[in-house]
């Protein structure tokens, strides 16, 4: 199975298929496989997988808000060990942003 985990690769996939690539699993799916965030063991229990698809609450309001819009997040550039600070954020109406500093700043990419 092809692993798609770059900003451009995931953004293009989202806009084409309206879902994350198959190498993404949610936090609860990862936990069911034995993932423990504090152990950094995702690559051990789910080889080739990245965390993605969970709701991003946008509590700080740094992403554009609109009635009915929901945001989801996915890890980017993950290979193994502990998760990094790169995330892609995508909305229910297909706005796509990235953060490389764990949600401090956001840049629109699509």
Swiss-Prot record:
The keyword Hydrolase applies. GO terms for cellular component: extracellular region. Pfam families: Ribonuclease. GO terms for molecular function: RNA binding; RNA endonuclease activity. Its EC number is 3.1.27.-. It is found in: Secreted. Keywords: Endonuclease, Hydrolase, Nuclease, Secreted. Its main location: secreted. The keyword Plastid does not apply. The active site is at 73 (proton acceptor), 102 (proton donor). It is an enzyme of class 3 (hydrolase). InterPro entries: Barnase, N1-like, Ribonuclease/ribotoxin. Hydrolyzes phosphodiester bonds in RNA, poly- and oligoribonucleotides resulting in 3'-nucleoside monophosphates via 2',3'-cyclophosphate intermediates. Belongs to the ribonuclease N1/T1 family. This is Ribonuclease.
């Amino acid at each position: 199975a092809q692993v798609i985990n770059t900003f451009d690769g995931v953004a293009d996939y989202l806009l084409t298929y309206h879902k994350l690539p198959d190498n993404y699993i949610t936090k609860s799916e990862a936990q069911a496989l034995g993932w423990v965030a504090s152990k950094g063991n995702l690559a051990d229990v789910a080889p080739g997988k990245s965390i993605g698809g969970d709701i991003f609450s946008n509590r700080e309001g740094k992403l554009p808000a609109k009635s009915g819009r929901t945001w989801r997040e996915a890890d980017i550039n993950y290979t193994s060990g502990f998760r990094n600070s790169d995330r892609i954020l995508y909305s229910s109406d297909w706005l796509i942003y990235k953060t490389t500093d764990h949600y401090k700043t956001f840049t629109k990419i699509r």
